[in-house]
Regions:
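Charged docking surfaces used in two-component/phosphorelay signaling
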Residues: 24-32
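Active-site beta3 strand of CheY-like receiver
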Residues: 53-59
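Receiver (REC) domain active-site loop signature in two-component systems and cognate sites
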Residues: 64
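Short hydrophobic/Thr-rich beta-strand motif most characteristic of the beta2 strand and flanking loop
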Residues: 34-41, 49
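C-terminal output helix
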Residues: 97, 115-124
């Protein structure tokens, strides 16, 4: 199990979103912050990837077909898979009720789409990652 701060842990990210454009933008930002990145276009694929290798952080869209982000998060939080990843719920909705629901469901933080690099850095820092942009950023 991951203990203490994630500031010294290997930084691995899983982006879960049904939009290829959103996954591409998030990947570019995370890679400039020295994350090793994988992505999934749906919840079932994301859960299978987590069973293989649990990332340290998951960017999770909550509006996806077949299995929404809430169900993915519920299954992750009930799973005995080992390390508990930090989960940032991603949304285009500025709905306080939906954001509160995500946080009550076990999300560590939320982030609005479209992604802003500085905001993503701040959110990652809030959940325990020391993020410094690489020189190529």
């Amino acid at each position: 199990m991951m203990t203490g701060s994630t500031k010294n842990a290997a930084k691995t990210a899983l982006i879960v979103d049904d939009s290829a454009v959103i996954r591409k933008v998030a990947r570019r930002i995370l890679e400039t912050l020295d994350f090793s990145v994988r992505d999934a276009e749906d919840g079932a694929t994301a859960l299978a990837m987590c069973a293989e290798a649990m990332p340290t952080v998951i960017l999770l869209d909550w509006n996806m077909p077949n299995m929404d982000g809430y169900e993915v998060l519920r299954r992750l939080r009930q799973s005995p898979l080992g390390d508990r990843p930090k989960v940032l719920f991603c949304t285009t909705e500025n709905d306080v009720g939906a954001i509160a629901r995500a946080l009550h469901a076990g999300a560590d933080e939320y982030i609005m789409k479209p992604f802003d690099r500085e905001i993503m850095m701040a959110k990652l820092d809030q959940v325990g990652f020391a993020v410094r942009p690489s020189e190529a950023a």
